[in-house]
Every structure is written in structure tokens, then in C-alpha cells.
């Protein structure tokens, strides 16, 4: 890992295998959990919450994307060729995406904007799962002391129009 970060600076083959193994463990759990929930009651919806910062979320051992999304082909240096196989979006009936950007970063196309987080999640889900995106209104820069009611309509618009729904984490 790069000094002072949690990111792999120049990933080796063994590091990529470890990252893929960790994602496989979570994938296999999600696959079994979804099957168990649906075996008890097929009408119960099964889902998950994840942080939308996919570019660094691999450090949590999670690949929340569709297995149709190929992060190695998309240029993520930490992803092995088989990492895509451990995406688990197709095992969920819905997902919540934490679009936890600063209060001043509502609109945009890239990660670290609320709209960008939701747009990028849609690309990574490949239509496998409906999802709601939303902000953390208690922790990121600009939200710590409240007083942001005036920007909530923009936040709702940015997230809900790039996702299938909206939620708020407080």
C-alpha cells in the first residue's frame, strides 16, 4: 500500500489475488444470504448498503458492482482479470449507495460529487439492480453543523435523477 494511504500504489499479482479473494468471500456470502432469504419468503426483498466510492472501496473487500462490469478493463490497476466475477449486484433486489460528498459537491460527473457517485453506480450496476443514492447529512464537509436545508432540493434532484430512488444517511 502507498505510504499513508489505504490504496495499492503499484499492485503486484499477489495483491490483486488477495483483493479478488476478499471480494469473493463477500460475494459468496451475499449469494448464499440472498438465496436463504428468498427460500424463506420469495416476496421479501434482499439488498445492501455500500459506499459509492468504488475506486477505493476494494480496500473494504467488497465488489458491489455487476459481474458484467469489468473494473480491470475500465483501468482500475488494483483489479485482477477475475475480480469482475465477484460483483454481487445481481444477487440483490435493491441497493443503497452512499453518495457522501461535501455539501458543496452536489453536481458533477465523477466520484466525490453526489450526482457523480449515483451516475457512476448506474454504470457499474449494468441494469442488474435498482438503487437509491443519497448523502450523509451529518459528517462530510459542510454538513457537520447542520443548516443545509436550502440545498436539499438540489441534493434530491442530483441523486434521484441519476438513481432510481433517494435516501438520507444522518
Annotated model-derived regions:
Residues 1-92, 98-103:
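Polysaccharide-binding and catalytic clefts of secreted carbohydrate-active enzymes
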Amino acid at each position: 500500500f502507498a505510504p499513508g494511504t489505504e490504496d495499492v500504489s503499484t499492485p503486484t499479482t499477489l495483491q490483486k489475488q488477495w483483493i479478488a479473494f476478499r471480494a469473493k468471500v463477500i460475494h459468496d456470502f451475499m449469494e448464499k444470504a440472498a438465496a436463504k432469504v428468498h427460500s424463506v419468503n420469495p416476496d421479501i426483498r434482499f439488498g445492501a448498503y455500500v459506499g459509492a466510492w468504488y475506486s477505493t472501496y476494494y480496500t473494504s473487500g467488497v465488489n458491489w458492482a455487476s459481474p458484467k462490469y469489468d473494473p480491470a478493463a475500465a483501468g482500475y490497476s488494483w483489479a485482477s482479470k477475475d475480480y469482475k466475477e465477484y460483483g454481487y449486484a445481481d444477487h440483490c433486489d435493491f441497493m443503497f449507495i452512499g453518495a457522501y460528498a461535501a455539501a458543496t459537491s452536489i453536481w458533477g460527473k465523477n466520484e466525490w460529487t453526489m450526482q457523480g457517485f449515483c451516475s457512476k453506480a448506474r454504470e457499474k450496476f449494468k441494469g442488474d439492480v435498482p438503487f437509491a443514492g443519497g448523502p450523509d447529512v451529518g459528517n462530510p464537509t459542510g454538513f457537520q453543523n447542520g443548516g443545509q436545508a436550502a440545498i436539499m432540493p438540489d441534493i434530491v434532484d442530483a441523486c434521484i435523477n441519476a438513481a432510481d430512488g433517494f435516501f438520507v444517511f444522518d
